[in-house]
Amino acid sequence: DSIDNEPWRYAVQIDYYRRLAAGELGFQLVYEGKVEPGLFGLRLNDRPADESFTVYDHPHVRIYKKVDSLSAAEIHERLLWGASQPWYPMRNAPNKTLMLGVPASETPTSNDANWNSVAISNTPFAIVVWLLAIELLGLAVAPIAATAFRASPDRGAFSARMIGLLMVGWLVWIGASLNWWPARTLVVSIITITVAACAWGWYVLRKRSGRPIELPSVRVWLAALGIWGTGFAFFLMLRAIYPDFWQTWFGGEKPFELAYLRAIARSTEFPPYDPWYSGGIINYYYYGWHLVATVTRLTGLGVSLGFQLAVATIPALLILQIVGLTTTITSSWRQRRPRPTVIIAAVTSVVAVSIIGNLDALAQIISMRGLPRTGFDFWRSTRVIDFTINEFPYFTAIWADLHPHMIDLPVIMLVLTLVSGLVLAPPRDRQTVIVVFSLLALALGTAAVTNSWDAPLCAGTILAGGIWAGARVGGRPGITIIVGAIAAIFAAWIMFLPFFSGFYSVVGDISRTATGSPLGEFLVVWGIFFLVVLVVVIADAVILGRRRTGWRDALVAGIACLAGGTAAFAFAVVRGGTVPLSAFVALWLAAGIISAGSAGAAPLRLGRVITIVSVVAAIGIGAIASHRPAAVIALSFALVAAWYAIQTRPARALPWILVGLGCLAIAGVEFVFISDDLSGGDWQRMNTVFKFYNQAWLLLGAGSALLLAHLWSRSRTLPAGDIDHRSAANKDITLVPHPRTAMRSAVVRRSACVVGAVAIVTGLLYPTFGTTARLAQDMPSSPQFLTLDGYAWMNGGTIQNATGDTIEFDGDLKAIEWLNANARGNPVILEASIGPYRGNGSRISSATGLPTVLGWDRHQRQQRYPAGIDRRMSDVHTVYNDTSLPSKLEMLRRYDVRYVIVGDVERYWNSADNPAPYASAAGLDAFNALVGNGLTVAFESGHTRVYEVTPFARLAPAPGAVHIR
């Protein structure tokens, strides 16, 4: 049994014993004797135990009798799979093999994610079931969420659903990863009930002990349901209008996501098998799909329907989590009428983060000289900066790719909400500390294994928030909080150690960017948020900077920035270079931003150290204008945000911190990028910009919206009521403003609010015109009625290849339905590997979850070693074109293929560069020649035929051969 633990070393031996036990080598089992330890009638499988215990104490004995004599060629054919596995003659594998160690067909799977046939056949009922499942997950952990957000007026009602999903999902995953229990529907149900019992049992104990947990009111819970339910209904309606899982040019990566989601939903152990690299494990950030699969298992709605519902659920939960963040922060503001401010802040934040787009929509309308009826390019707005991706949450929602970066958006917002609550109301009792930091560890770990790009932001936020909260409390309780924050980061790694221990990252080192973003394109992406922040700063500068010292501070800071830029420009010219016009524009903009911030925040009156640091920072920012003009703007806003944050109360500092973090994120990618498989080309920083811009949109959107709401709330307050200057600290001072001063301040602030609101409303141009443009991109065969059937377009769906031949998909759809209904276990299929996007390649494995020899090679290169991918790509093409029957069958045996797909994609797909069809006519005819001699026709419909590789004959054990006691 020990050789099973080293498949890289004993692949052939393992395959031999596996075939022997299956009766495929001509030997019949005539006797099997073993003793299984037991207690109270329960048997314990001790096979994984050390051999010194099993072999020498109670060996497992098998006796085989030779019945059939196989030739050397027949034995060779049976052991082809083992002989083709990567072999390393060492005790330890030199690298992570990323392989299962057994054929994919023998991995344990379950098809219990579609147990609810009644709901699957009734879409309205299925929607209700899904909604109830999300609510159930939230209610299960309501006492835990209420403890974590005990100081927030919502008492965790806005975060409970995410917390419940994360808790249940992790418990299912960790058990399946450590082989404690399988990932199945029954286990998900038991864990959900257990979590609810523990949470509510704890609630009862706390109540009896005189320390009750204050739960959210029914009204607040229903309000949360209404918020996320409304968002869910809106985004689900978009999916019902445009349900297609694939489209020739604008289909996205849904086939990839569906394949992996199906494989995860079918896997009972983790890591799951790779559906696009048979015999391999998924070496990708699959955990977000596991969370979706958890709800799919719980509801029994199946992956196809679950995918559509999840695509609507994620942005809806993001909206709810944004409301949770704004409620947590704004409820701590000191104001006379808190409720209107909370509502305005929540609505503004939701719109700014989840609904609006960037300024490219306005640019398109201006270029069209009027409101467009047709021709609006919704895609262009996400590719503003050349060779990068500049997506934002609304595009992500209507694009409807269930990708890791999408799934992780509400997780990031949950971390920000938890940290905000930690800072504003630091926990002091031990139980609350444990709850808060346990949830932070869970959320951080989830972010790391869902979309690792988000982990640094989440970890840094937790650490900084813990230090800040600890400093506010002081003493031993403060130290406990700081230690808790550090422990949460380590706990996150330990909680997900099974994932990291088997994961191999193809992402390389941090590299320096050759060039930054053009200033104009950069401002198109971020101009809305920058303008909102700028009007807030200018309002303060106008009101507070009217003092002589305010304008003097502004002059000093602005001159420092200009001095740094001028020196850098001169140095560039001396070295023979040129200074682009954008650098001058960026320098003067930065000087203006810094001057206004200095007048409003008055950092130069906070002591000598702050003054020196501020001046040096202003000089440094100006100095980089010559070669990174975009970074200059972002860093200027970051500096101003820092000035405000260090001298205001935590509740008012948090929006500035969000803005500052967002600006640092987008400034950082102007200097460095993470090396990946795109390194060395024009697109080398594509993923870095893409991922960090996603985070920055959340931070800047929420931060700027909160600043605007706060500005509105101050329209009736004292001019200086928002800044806690050191000179007035710890003094009980009541200031009565002059009526004229108060009126002037109110006018300035309200005018600034109008400008900021107009900026945000401008962003609504994108959803107004981009939504209809996106919905118009469905396949011509897509149903003209509302449906969530993502494969309905295949019924009558066709495309043209490069030479004008028609590729039909009717037969493929029937083959998919047949395989889903009749394929048992986890058989390997063979279909054309034609790369991503255009030709609907790998459509059968995507729609069934069955492992194929090779799916989209481009995505596999992001996950595993290239040599195996190249070999498989060549082998798959060879199988479809080879006319030698023995070699054709040998290749199928080598990859343990059970079903061979021959449809129009295999028959006709080609490209302009290579007009020859993917499979030659002679190669396809050879499959027919093998029928009856290694193949059978298992299914046929239209132009699609499914061949089944004839399995090897098996000898069943002799009657009465097995003896177990």
Task: Say what each PLM segment does.
Residues 1-107, 766-965:
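Extracytoplasmic
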Residues 32, 39-53, 58, 71-218, ...:
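Membrane-embedded, hydrophobic transmembrane alpha-helices
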Residues 136, 185-239, 336-350, 434, ...:
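Start-transfer (signal-anchor) and selected internal transmembrane alpha helices
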Residues 312-315, 458, 683-710:
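Hydrophobic/aromatic-rich transmembrane helices and adjacent perimembrane loops
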Residues 483-493, 560-562, 608-617, 711-771:
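Signature aromatic-anchored transmembrane alpha helix within multi-pass, membrane-resident enzymes
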